Amino acid sequence: MRVLGIETSCDETAVAVLDNGKNVVVNFTVSQIEIHQKFGGVVPEVAARHHLKNLPILLKKAFEKVPPETVDVVAATYGPGLIGALLVGLSAAKGLAISLEKPFVGVNHVEAHVQAVFLANPDLKPPLVVLMVSGGHTQLMKVNEDYSMEVLGETLDDSAGEAFDKVARLLGLGYPGGPVIDRVAKKGDPEKYSFPRPMLDDDSYNFSFAGLKTSVLYFLQREKDYKVEDVAASFQKAVVDILVEKTFRLARNLGIRKIAFVGGVAANSMLREEVRKRAERWNYEVFFPPLELCTDNALMVAKAGYEKAKRGMFSPLNLNADPNLNV
C-alpha cells in the first residue's frame, strides 16, 4: 500500500510517500523557521500563506518521482494545530483524493508523532509509555496492545517547548528556543541555579511549566551578575528532571518496561542523555525517533495514515480541520 502524507499543522510544509508503512519513497520538508525568527515565534497567518506557496512545489517534486496514479491512499493532518495552516494541507489532500479517486485519511498530529517511533523501530510492539513533548504539546500516554492511545497526563498551562521558547526570549537567545537553549546550555553549569520543579511530587502525571518560566523571569529581574549559559543550563535541567521523573514514574506504576519519547523536544540532548542513564540503571527499554522524525514531518503522517487505512479507517471528505483535536 502506497500512502501520500501531507503535514501543514504549524510551520513546516511536508510531503512524503511511504510504501507498506515502512519503505520511504519520497520525503520533502520546507521549514519556515527563518521566516518566523524575526517575529520571535510562529505567526499563524504568515505560516498559512507560506504553506500555500510551498505545498504545490513539494507535491510537484513528489509526483516527478512517484506517478500520482500509483498512490493508494492520501493522508493529511487535520488537527491539532493552527487552523489556517491545517486547512491548506487538508484541502490539498481532499482535492487529490477526489481527483485520483483514492480514499482519504485524516490524521491526528499527536498520534502521527507516536507513529514516528514505530516507523523508526519496526519491531517495536506495544504496550508502551510515550511522552509527547513539543512546542504545542506535553502529554504522557499509554499505547495499548491494540495500538489505541490513552492520555494519562498533560500540561495544565505551557508546553515544555513553549517554556523553552519563552525563556530563550527572556535570555535574548532568539527563536526557536529549544535548539538554541540546548546548544548554549552545553557551555553552562546545570547545577548553578536552583529553579523550581512544579508538580514534580504531585500524584498526578500532569505538568506545569508556567511557574518555572516565571521563576526564571523573576531571577533575571533580580540578579544582575549571571552567565546566560548557566541560566540556560539550570532551566533546561529543571525541565528535563520533570519530564524524566514523571515519565518513568508512570511506566513503573503501570508495570511497562518500554518508553518512547517523541516530538520536537525529544531531540534535546540533555533529555536523551538523562533518559538513557536512567533506563540503563533501572533496566528499561527506551526509544527515540531519529532527529529528523522528532520535528514535524510528513513521513509520520503517511505512517499513521497507513495504519488507519490498513484497518479500513478511512475519513469522509467533509472532515474539517480541528485546531484543538484530542487523542
From Swiss-Prot:
Binding positions (Fe cation): 109, 113, 296
InterPro entries for the chain: ATPase_NBD (IPR043129), Gcp-like_dom (IPR000905), KAE1/TsaD (IPR017861), TsaD (IPR022450)
List locations, semicolon-separated.
Answer: Cytoplasm
Q: Which cofactor does it need?
A: Fe(2+)
GO-annotated biological processes: tRNA threonylcarbamoyladenosine modification
Manner of cofactor binding, per the entry note: Binds 1 Fe(2+) ion per subunit.
Binding residues annotated for substrate, in chain numbering: 132-136, 165, 178, 182, 268
In terms of superkingdom, the source organism counts as Bacteria
- State the CDD domains in the record: ASKHA_NBD_TsaD_bac
Q: Which of the seven top EC classes does this enzyme belong to?
A: transferase
| Signal sequence residues | none
Keyword entries, A-Z = Acyltransferase, Cytoplasm, Iron, Metal-binding, Transferase, tRNA processing
Query: What SUPFAM superfamilies does the entry give?
Result: Actin-like ATPase domain (SSF53067)
Instruction: Report which reactions are catalysed by this protein.
Output: L-threonylcarbamoyladenylate + adenosine(37) in tRNA = N(6)-L-threonylcarbamoyladenosine(37) in tRNA + AMP + H(+)
Q: Could you say which EC number(s) this protein's record lists? A: 2.3.1.234
Just give the chief location class: cytoplasm
GO (cellular component) term, any one: cytoplasm
Classification via HAMAP family: TsaD
What family does the entry list?
A: Belongs to the KAE1 / TsaD family.
What does this protein's UniProt record list under function? Answer: Required for the formation of a threonylcarbamoyl group on adenosine at position 37 (t(6)A37) in tRNAs that read codons beginning with adenine. Is involved in the transfer of the threonylcarbamoyl moiety of threonylcarbamoyl-AMP (TC-AMP) to the N6 group of A37, together with TsaE and TsaB. TsaD likely plays a direct catalytic role in this reaction.
Q: What is the official name of this protein in its record?
A: tRNA N6-adenosine threonylcarbamoyltransferase
